[in-house]
């Protein structure tokens, strides 16, 4: 039984899987967009989000941890100087997965995984918004009960 065993095996042994993830993380951070299969992209998203969070920390220990995963020192520099500062206000969710369709050879679902570009604006709910929503729901309920009462009286 596979109870409490998270992560996909992707048809590879552990060392091959780790090497593939390191290669894909390096490519994604270098090019900021890659095409791959759906399962690989979902696993890659976890590692890339962790690397960008390390980049946001920005200290020497975080840089050394990133070097363990990212295989190119230039890409590590790009992560810490260019990519991570774009996401200082964003609390996670640095990547986007866009479905493309299935691959011709083996019908595997293909996706594009890319770094999110637009600015993050945190949603702030105001008391006025909550009050307006509550009032609109109350008026809809009142109208529905009136309509039900009118139809009952018409009968």
UniProtKB/Swiss-Prot annotation:
PROSITE patterns: RIBOSOMAL_L17 (PS01167). It comes from the Bacteria. The keyword rRNA processing does not apply. Keywords: Ribonucleoprotein, Ribosomal protein. One of its GO terms (molecular function) is structural constituent of ribosome. GO terms for biological process: translation. GO terms for cellular component: cytosolic large ribosomal subunit. It holds the Pfam family Ribosomal_L17. SUPFAM superfamilies: Prokaryotic ribosomal protein L17 (SSF64263). Belongs to the bacterial ribosomal protein bL17 family. PANTHER family: LARGE RIBOSOMAL SUBUNIT PROTEIN BL17M, RIBOSOMAL PROTEIN L17. Part of the 50S ribosomal subunit. Contacts protein L32. This is Large ribosomal subunit protein bL17. It comes from Syntrophotalea carbinolica (strain DSM 2380 / NBRC 103641 / GraBd1).
């Amino acid at each position: 039984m596979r109870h409490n065993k998270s992560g996909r095996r992707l048809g590879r042994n552990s060392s091959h899987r780790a090497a593939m993830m390191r290669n894909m993380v390096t490519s994604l951070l270098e090019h900021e967009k890659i095409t791959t299969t759906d399962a690989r992209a979902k696993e890659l998203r976890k590692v890339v989000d962790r690397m960008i969070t390390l980049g946001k920390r920005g200290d020497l220990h975080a840089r050394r941890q990133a070097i363990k995963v990212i295989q190119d020192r230039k890409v590590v520099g790009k992560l810490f100087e260019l990519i991570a500062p774009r996401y200082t206000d964003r609390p996670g969710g640095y990547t986007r997965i866009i479905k493309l369709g299935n691959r011709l050879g083996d019908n595997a679902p293909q996706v594009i995984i890319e770094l999110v570009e637009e600015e993050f604006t945190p949603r702030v709910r105001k008391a006025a918004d909550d009050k307006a929503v509550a009032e609109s729901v109350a008026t809809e309920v009142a109208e529905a009960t009136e309509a039900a009462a009118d139809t009952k009286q018409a009968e």
